[in-house]
Amino acid sequence: MEDIFNFFDKPKDPLHFSSIKISISSPDKIRERSFGEVKKPETINYRTFKPERDGLFCAKIFGPTKDYECNCGKYKRMKHRGIVCEKCGVEVIPSKVRRERLGHIDLATPVAHIWFLKSLPSRIGNLMDITLKDLEKVLYFEAYVVTDPKETGLAFGTVFSEDQYQKALEEYSYGFEAGMGAAAIRTCLTSMDLDQLSEQLRIEMQEATSEAKRKKTAKRLKVMEAFKNSGNKPEWMILECIPVLPPELRPLVPLDGGRFATSDLNDLYRRVINRNNRLKRLMELQAPEVIIRNEKRMLQEAVDALFDNGRRGRAIAGPNKRPLKSLSDMLKGKSGRFRQNLLGKRVDYSGRSVIVVGPELRLHQCGLPKKMALELFKPFIYNKLEERGFVTTIKSAKKMVEKEKPEVWDVLEEVIKEHPVLLNRAPTLHRLGIQAFEPVLIEGKAIQLHPLVCTAFNADFDGDQMAVHLPLSVESQVEARVLMMSTNNILSPAHGKPIIVPSQDMVLGIYYMTREKHFALGEGKIFASADEVNIAWDAGEIHLQARIKVRMKNLVSDEKPTLIETTTGRVLLRDILPDAVPYATINKVMTKKELSNLVDVCYRLAGNKETVILADKLKAIGFRYAAKAGISISINDMVIPEGKPAIITRATEEVQEIQNQYTEGLITDGERYNKVIDIWAKSTEDIAKEMLDNLSRDTILDPEGKEVKVPSFNAIHMMADSGARGSAQQIRQLAGMRGLMAKPSGEIIETPITANFREGLTVLQYFISTHGARKGLADTALKTANSGYLTRRLVDVAQDAIITEADCGTIDGLTVSSLTEGGEVIEHIGDRILGRVALDDILDPVTGDVLVPANEEIDENLVARIEAAGLEKVKIRSVLTCESRRGICAKCYGRDLARGHLVNRGEAVGVIAAQSIGEPGTQLTMRTFHIGGTASRRAEQTALEARNEGFAKFININYVTNSEGHHIVMNRNGELAIVDETGREREKYGVVYGAKIKVSPQEKVTQGQSVAEWDPYTMPILTEIAGRVKFGDVIEGVTMEEQVDEVTGLSRKVIIETRDADKRPRITIKDESGKTAKIGDSLLARYYLPVGSNINVLEDTEVNAGDVIAKIPRETTKTKDITGGLPRVAELFEARKPKDFAVITEIDGVVAFGKDAKGKRKVLVTPELGEPKEYLIPKGKHISVHEGDHVRAGEALMDGSSNPHDILRVLGQKELAKYLVDEVQEVYRLQGVKINDKHIETIVRQMLRRVRVKDVGDTNLLIDDQIERWVFEEENEKAMDKGGRPATAESLLLGITKASLSTESFISAASFQETTKVLTQASIEGKIDSLRGLKENVIMGRLIPAGTGLALYRNLRMVAEEPVIIPEPVEPEDEEIYEEEA
């Protein structure tokens, strides 16, 4: 009887476990877990559809096909539960056991597991020290392996071919044992003594002379240690029996028409069973060795195909010619188990529909079609109907809902109240792609979306669809409301600025109402209060844009009311402002930028609730006035500037002039091309400038009849100026000149399109345009995929970066200063330190007062104080220097950008960082085609103009004065500063080698004066001394060729690569006596010419100091688009070595040149103390340092990009992090995308997690082992506690893919990439996954250990002490107090 009651029990909770282990299964384990051996390849009986006995679907082994019913039908129903039928041997239990019961196949001969054989590096091969090629020969019966050498002196594991084996037999006459196939390998593996072997290998490793030998030994040792420590036995890599998957997981489904659909696995198992049975029979019949060998080989191949089809040889195909899906394929790739079913599942209680705009919604609402709501909230409705007594059973409730009776709608209204729903728009690129709203029931079938959240979803209403999800449990509803509600996501997690900002029409409306119109109705009137303005406006006495004066009191402070110059519209706008926001914030023309600023100020001063109310009011007022303004554009609004023809004529003449110079041979073709492009780029800019000036100014008559220029109300200009739609770039194409276009390859076509869209394009111009436009479309498709993949890799590497503690107590941090480029500050120090935590006390440089105490968050007010004090550098805490073992501490991270306060524990900052970097990647990729491929190339900077007046100051510049009296810079990294009277630097510029400086040291400089100029397209080689030119090793056809220009017929000498290692083309300068001139005391005036340089002088001519003797052309410029972008970002995060990376010096010292070696040039750097270091630089590369130059560690000795690994090695982690952060930021800055530095730092931290062991000391580590930094530190602590010698290691920089694959969690790594490889390695090591990251917990179906799932929050308990009322003096009982578990 009890059994019956138990049957209706609630289903058991899933197992509670804290970690999961993977290891190799032993044959005994497989048999132990199996419920019987599968002996026959039959599946089901095709007439009765009953499973065949002992077959692949056998009910005796795997359980009954129908609940509580045996196969022959003798026992049916629940009362016979647990009985085994004596006729058919089937147990009477529920049929769902067919999903979990395993069978097995006993193999007639052992076979190798293909993962351990073929997954590189081959584990079996590694252990036995046999190459994979030989190992395959043995396993597939083409060669013998020595399993026991006995006294013959043969090495254990030697591989013999058939002939060699016969010879050996004759020689040793059976004094040894050898075999072939997996059985022989198994014998070898069983007889291995791992302890003794690993000792031997350790000794070998210490004695190893060559690097290669050491590495090989280390690899073997690693596999051995893994087997030793995990308790796996090597012979388990060879299978004696194979487990058979439960039949429900490889179903056989009858289709109509008597055919069957089957899982590929059944075919693969059938082949294995057939071959196995055949082999057994052949062995019983004692067939000839050849036949048995062949059958064994076929069995090995069948098992290989079952485990990993296509890994070896050709994949086995099914009847329809496509490869069968093996067990490995079930796990691998996008449609494998991990990514398809475990990381992303389809869910119920969801629906999707097209979205339309809902302008009358509040920010926290969305419009939900009644039909959808009825379906989504069904169970809730049934429940309510029953509660209300409308129905008595669920069935009748169902009928009632189907008929859509009026009561149902009333109930639905009630159910829906206060029950948030989640809206999601694919692709969900960052966390704002899913937000919670309160549903409002609407007619129709489209979801209504609030216009202000479109930016976050990146949604528009041209047919986008969105999905609705319903949070069911109370906890999930609370989280949706508190964390995900659109009103709680006003700030963007990527940069901390508001993301809920009016856009498009709303901006235009507010812009229009805050503009000033000269001489409008009511101009100059003075009002006593804002209310009076409202009355006058309602009465139609004043114009919306009239300039008026109003007496206003400051609501923020108690100052006296003052007269403020303003306009009617701005006073009207003030009505919607919260009191805390000062009027000055809106007393200006409100562009999109200003509106964003307004929302930001409101959030900081008035708080979240007020901001939400303001946002909704802005939306309403914006739409209202946009409608009132009635702005529309006509073709006449695109005013073509009058000066356009003149500019084009001038440019054409200049181009002709350049062409003439080229024809005369004064410049090379490359220079000509670059200059032509420059002229056109500049002309396009000029026309654009004039056009924008025209558009933005109108000329009108004032009351006296005089002409005055006033800001224009041109519709196109207003749209672009307000930031509502369109950009200067697009207007330029409409009314200016289309400009230069790029070829698909990225080069710029040198004939520009001089027409604009208003004038119309000629056929040729149209044709050139199509180039760029098509490239834009093609790029978009490709880049979206690339960007998505980048995001996926970033998320994977950073997913376990979670805020785990409040403060790690580190004393380390980063020094941050303003970012400058070309003397211009691109990012102020304030923007970089906002929301970070100060490392030490920040002191005022003048008074020494503490501006910010140590470990305090630097907020907006403190930033203002720091900037006012004029601090140039600030030390802050950083994720990079955080010492938390797992995760990151809140103090090192700083402010949670989306919330505006210090980050909470449990915040998944890694994923947020990955999304913040990845999301704009996709946006940017999609942004290319809007401009339609117009080449946007800045005219290269060729001169420096002083921005301030002052005195010129040369900072380590070596220069010579040429014949014209200009100073020519002769070294790199010199700087030119402008200082004021007090000697304070106002601006500072780097000057390049070969630049002409037009001022002398200490000379007075006026503002706007040109102080230096240079040629950006070539890199000159200059002579430092006057004399006669002599060539050395400049031999035509060997090291130099005369290149004749087809167009001009003129030739020039170009240095080419030579086969002859001894030839080194150079130019020497001789003095009067014919000797090589000396520069200073010791240096010879000898200049080596790199490959590709053009010689500018003739032999035996006189040159002066500072003259150019040769030029190295720079590449023709390509347009900068985020193509330089996305791949560049990926390259940085993958830590790839650039193609031609520069050799950098590892020490400070003085440069000297040594003798050439192996066709490379030798550069010596000699420090003040110690040995000189030598660097070899390939010939033909331009060496950018000169003899006698001082260089600093980390400086490049030649042209080329930096190699991040070198930076880490030479300059350390902080410099590397700075380099990576700056480089990534530069790519995004080019696109105008803001990302906070800390996100990039978070990713870089994950890339720097590991170290490589250099010296093992007295620890258990292996040399060259790559391990987590904290594991290394722990091992060292252990060794030092015992008084041993610690190990040493060097920092490693891993690319994001590598870092993801080398995480501790094998589940996370396997679900990312290279599944088989990861699982193979993990099972050998017997790895334990302690489920610490997010991904592995999602896969195991648990709550993630972040956010509200953090243990810290899961274990909170309420403590309630109830007052004890004692009526009579009774024996008091103990009160129960629930302790809070921290």
From Swiss-Prot:
GO BP field: DNA-templated transcription
Enzyme Commission number, as recorded: 2.7.7.6
UniProt keyword annotations, A-Z: DNA-directed RNA polymerase, Magnesium, Metal-binding, Nucleotidyltransferase, Transcription, Transferase, Zinc
Substrates-to-products reaction catalysed: RNA(n) + a ribonucleoside 5'-triphosphate = RNA(n+1) + diphosphate
Function field: DNA-dependent RNA polymerase catalyzes the transcription of DNA into RNA using the four ribonucleoside triphosphates as substrates.
Homology family: Belongs to the RNA polymerase beta' chain family.
Protein name in the entry: DNA-directed RNA polymerase subunit beta'
